[in-house]
């Protein structure tokens, strides 16, 4: 059985000036607790539903014009970790992503991840590789659009 755990909800901010702490939370994943099969990848030996978890954030830094979201596994045995999600150009008016969100319907974009696909790619660590940490980060950005694809 694969040990699939999410143990870190990380938050990084690129905009300075908020009087309050920019905070990321989720109803679907909790630090130090196993992730549900819903958030496991469908493929590469895993048979999850491959849905992104619900995420919400508050106390957005002043001057934020858009957001980016990343999900990263620093414990993947690749030498450089494993990127599970890269979403960007999410409008500043958005402060919550529902489970299984279609980023394009919000006006955002998603980039290629380490599975070789675009969009969210759930957890799927190699068998007998121990626990993995999945770091979800919301980036508050000072520009409306990034010149990325």
Language model features with spans:
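Bacterial N-terminal signal peptides that target proteins for export
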Residues: 1-8
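Bacterial N-terminal signal peptides
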Residues: 8-17
